């Protein structure tokens, strides 16, 4: 099972707009410059804040449609969309199974014989809530409801199942989760219905988890339509130090359509395998799959009757990875989220066919290997995927500021690129008046280096008029751009991309000097 995102619907504003249901709600995102001026009028019009850091408000769709032209005319409107519904999809191949069968996956992921740590990095399950009266969660320590949980049997079915795989305790009943001592946090996205999940609640849940501090955020949900606001919430969480783990989807035998949030950058995407350690037919294939974990005929806690049952779907392989990631992070607290991302997937055990592939990514989750895997290079400026991520007034998330400034005119860093998850790194630099600036990238891989002028909107312009210089020679090693002096100082942008067609991941060093 995986929560399914219903097709996106833009809030039409023209004279031929389709009929908007009378009870519909909309999400309005203000521009950064308009936040102070427009917040109070929106609240007075009946809006509620969804994510203050993202400047997102929820209000009746009819009101949003009435206010939108004025907001747009005042350059105050960044995004407007209907608050869409999400719903739990049908369970794939569900069948009753003895509780002992729940343990088959434990040896597969390398935790037999290992002692899990005590409570540490939290796992936030953004889902349909947890049945806190279920035997697995009744009086369980370190179980936190971040908002009210819809009581069973109306709510909590999907979320209870997911959370039980993260951390069902050793309590003498039922199953044992991958990390039985985990700190489990739950954000119930299905309040008021129990089956329908709102986009606004997903955003609230991701934001609440990120605001609580670095941890693992489990998203066993998805859909075929890209949603800018959910993507921004994920980017913000990643910038604040959290690891977002998402289900690849259950359409492997239905043509493998795009699936979000699984296909977003900076999301650890999980497919599902069966008891034979082969990728399950339903598990969605895509270049964005990072690793797989058991997800077929896995016994979980169920809120329907406070019991347990066998379930199948990437919804259930995903929390196994989330719990494992929290275990590894607790045992290796010196890692940041960018390093943990790499550790979890690069330590995976390859499954046929050999090498990285669309079905299994890097392979099967291996907790023992992840605990021992060498720490990779940190990638501290992420997410920095384009100009709008690093501009100070963009409302995006790079918290480290520009590489160079008027006062600091030299810099050096080490970072990492990924052809699928992180193909572009952008940095803001200061070009002082009447001085040349040398930008140098060094890598064992073939990276391309470009420097863009202050008017750049996006580095995807290619060879646009804002390009100040480029070194895109098709070879590994040293790349350099020297920006010629100009009469006045100005801001510019450095772009580093992975060139050629070979290799998925590359580390590089970048220096800026006069």
Regions found by a protein language model. Give the residues of each.
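Active-site core segment of subtilase-fold serine proteases
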Residues: 98-185, 190-191, 201-205, 211-212, ...
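Substrate-binding/access-modulating region of protease and related hydrolase catalytic domains
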Residues: 186-266, 276-279, 285, 304-318, ...
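Acidic, Ser/Thr/Pro-rich low-complexity intrinsically disordered segments
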Residues: 360-361, 372, 408-514
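C-terminal subdomain of the subtilisin-like protease fold in secreted/lumenal serine endopeptidases
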Residues: 205-220, 228-229, 233, 240-242, ...
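Hydrolase catalytic cores
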Residues: 163-166, 185-190, 215, 247, ...
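Structural recognition of the beta-strand scaffold that forms the well-ordered cores
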Residues: 27, 81, 122-125, 176-177, ...
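Protease zymogen maturation seam
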Residues: 72-122, 130, 134-136, 383-402, ...
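Autoinhibitory propeptides
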Residues: 18, 36, 40-102
């Amino acid at each position: 099972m995986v929560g399914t995102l219903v097709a996106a619907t833009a809030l039409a504003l023209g004279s031929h707009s389709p009929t908007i249901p009378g009870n519909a709600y909309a999400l309005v995102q203000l521009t950064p410059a308009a936040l102070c001026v427009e917040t109070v009028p929106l609240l007075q019009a009946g809006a509620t804040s969804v994510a203050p850091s993202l400047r997102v408000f929820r209000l009746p769709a009819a009101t949003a449609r009435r206010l939108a032209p004025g907001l747009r005319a005042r350059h105050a409107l960044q995004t407007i969309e209907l608050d869409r519904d999400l719903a739990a999809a049908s369970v794939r191949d569900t069948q009753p199974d003895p509780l002992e069968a729940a343990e088959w996956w434990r040896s597969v992921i390398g935790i037999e014989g290992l002692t899990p740590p005590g409570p540490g990095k939290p796992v936030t399950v953004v889902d349909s809530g947890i049945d806190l009266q279920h035997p697995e969660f009744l009086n369980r320590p370190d179980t936190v409801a971040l908002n009210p949980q819809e009581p069973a049997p109306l709510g909590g079915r999907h979320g209870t199942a997911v959370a039980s795989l993260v951390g069902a305790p050793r309590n003498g009943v039922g199953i044992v989760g991958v990390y039985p001592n985990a700190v489990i946090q739950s954000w119930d996205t299905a309040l008021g219905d129990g089956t329908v999940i709102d986009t606004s609640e997903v955003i609230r849940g991701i934001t609440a988890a990120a605001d609580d501090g670095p941890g693992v955020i489990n998203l066993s949900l998805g859909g075929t339509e890209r949603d800018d606001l959910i993507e921004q919430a994920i980017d913000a969480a990643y910038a604040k130090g959290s690891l977002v783990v998402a289900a690849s989807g259950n359409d492997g035998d239905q043509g493998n359509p795009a699936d979000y949030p699984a296909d977003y950058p900076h999301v650890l995407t999980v497919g599902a395998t069966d008891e034979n350690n082969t990728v399950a037919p339903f598990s969605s294939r895509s270049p964005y799959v990072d690793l797989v974990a058991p997800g077929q005929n896995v016994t979980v806690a169920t809120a329907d009757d406070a019991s347990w049952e066998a379930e199948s779907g990437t919804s259930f392989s995903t929390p196994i990875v989330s719990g494992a990631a929290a275990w590894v992070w607790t045992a290796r607290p010196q890692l940041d989220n960018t390093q943990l991302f790499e550790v979890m997937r690069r330590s995976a055990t390859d499954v046929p066919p050999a090498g990285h592939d669309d079905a299994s990514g890097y392979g099967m989750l291996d907790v023992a290997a992840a605990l021992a895997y060498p720490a990779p290079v940190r990638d501290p400026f992420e997410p920095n995927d384009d100009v709008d991520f690093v501009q100070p007034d963009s409302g995006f998330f790079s918290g480290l500021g520009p590489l160079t400034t008027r006062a600091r005119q030299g810099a050096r860093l080490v970072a990492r690129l990924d052809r699928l998850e992180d193909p572009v790194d952008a940095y803001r630099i200061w070009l002082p008046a009447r001085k040349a600036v040398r930008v140098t990238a060094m890598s064992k891989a073939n990276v391309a280096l470009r420097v863009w002028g202050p008017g750049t909107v996006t580095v995807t312009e290619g060879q646009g008029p804002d390009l100040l210089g480029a070194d895109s020679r098709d070879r590994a090693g040293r790349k350099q751009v020297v920006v010629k002096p100009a009469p006045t100082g100005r801001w510019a942008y450095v772009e580093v991309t992975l060139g050629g067609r070979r290799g998925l991941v590359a580390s590089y060093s970048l220096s800026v000097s006069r």
